[in-house]
């Protein structure tokens, strides 16, 4: 209904790609979008953004989670995420076709 539910959000650690609030407002979701293969470096990046959200935006009763979205991951990213709290990785798939006429 015209309500913005996720958008790029400025922080003191850099711009957060998307910051979303759950319908019941119990959760803030930091979303980092990456093209192609995702490096383990992004784990530190999203943790900085999540730290900003915890310190500056979240209320006591709100949970802060992170989601990394990319085309593919690798073993280093999997290892880093295995010990990262409240961060998940999702793969996207693009099937783009162009037809003349």
Predicted regions and their residues:
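Charged, terminal alpha-helix-loop-beta segments
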Residues: 1-101
């Amino acid at each position: 209904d015209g309500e913005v539910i996720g958008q790029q959000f400025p922080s003191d650690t850099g711009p957060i790609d998307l910051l979303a609030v759950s319908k019941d407002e119990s959760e803030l979701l930091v979303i980092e979008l990456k093209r192609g293969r995702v490096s383990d470096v992004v784990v530190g990046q999203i943790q900085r953004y999540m730290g900003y959200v915890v310190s500056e935006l979240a209320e006591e009763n709100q949970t802060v989670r992170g989601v990394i979205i990319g085309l593919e991951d690798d073993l280093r990213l999997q290892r880093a995420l295995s010990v990262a709290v409240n961060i998940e990785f999702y793969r996207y798939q693009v099937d783009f076709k162009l037809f003349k006429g």
